[in-house]
Amino acid sequence: MERHGVQHLVSFASHPSEAPVLAECMELANGRLSSLSVVDPRAEGAPERVRRLLDLGFSGVLLFPAMHGYRPDGPELADVLDVLEEDGAVALVHCGLLEVRLRDHFGIPRNYDLSLANPLHLILAADDHPRTHFVIPHFGAGMFRETLMAGTQCSNLYVDTSSSNSWIRTQTRALRLADVFERALGVFGSRRILFGTDSSVFPRGWRHDILVAQREALGACGLDGRGKNDILHGNAARLLGLEPRTDAPATTPTIESGTGRS
């Protein structure tokens, strides 16, 4: 983190057994690490588990509707969202294309129902839970138009910029990364976009190339310094309850996948 000028990062527990380890890491990180945990809301005792996670200092949950087989606005998730609402916590909801490389490495089939991962399914859930911060990673991972539509409807819905955004190849109209940022800014403004790289485990580590590409895209959009600071730092700091910085840094609290073991 020091070498790359990263002030704060977010990691996630991809299995319940990892949560205590991450809780200990947060204690040792002197306030520079926040954590989310993957939660399957269909699992027995899921709401109680979320309550324990929040009490341990977790900032919220990471949800995979396509992987676990439910709609975000369905009854399976309602009780979990009610717990998040109590604390105004974060629900990072993976929508669109889903690729988990470790699962691919072990030959686990990609039997994901992408119809369940439509950002439009978040609208009713977000409306019913106005204190919960819903974040769609990767600009919707191919469901970009739907992400923009959902963001237009819901003021508590955010988007993150993480990964190489290779989903752009799936769009019927050619898009540059700068085009993606420009359209996202038109809907979400600079206050509801969160920078991220989706950096993962070593040996790859920190994705400096993604930071460079996204800085260039923001520059091409003509965004002013305050807007850049919102995206690269301030918005994540606000959602995570961190102390805001006033020096408009060029580096950020990053939305990361820390374990990469979903």
Please tell me what each predicted stretch does:
Residues 1, 53, 61, 84, ...:
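Conserved, mostly hydrophobic/aromatic
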Residues 1-8, 183, 187-194, 203-262:
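Mid-to-C-terminal alpha-helical segments outside catalytic/metal-binding sites
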Residues 3-8, 30-32, 127-134:
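Short, surface-exposed connector motifs at secondary-structure boundaries
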Residues 7-8, 15-104, 111-113:
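Active-site gating/metal-coordination segments in enzymes
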Residues 10-13, 38, 135-137, 160, ...:
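Short beta-strand segments
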Residues 11-20, 40-46, 68-73, 140-144, ...:
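Acidic-and-aromatic substrate-binding clefts and catalytic sites of carbohydrate-active enzymes
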Residues 33-38, 157-162, 248-249:
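Short hydrophobic/aromatic-enriched beta-strand-loop microsegments
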Residues 60, 74-194:
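Catalytic pocket-lining loop regions of alpha/beta-barrel enzymes
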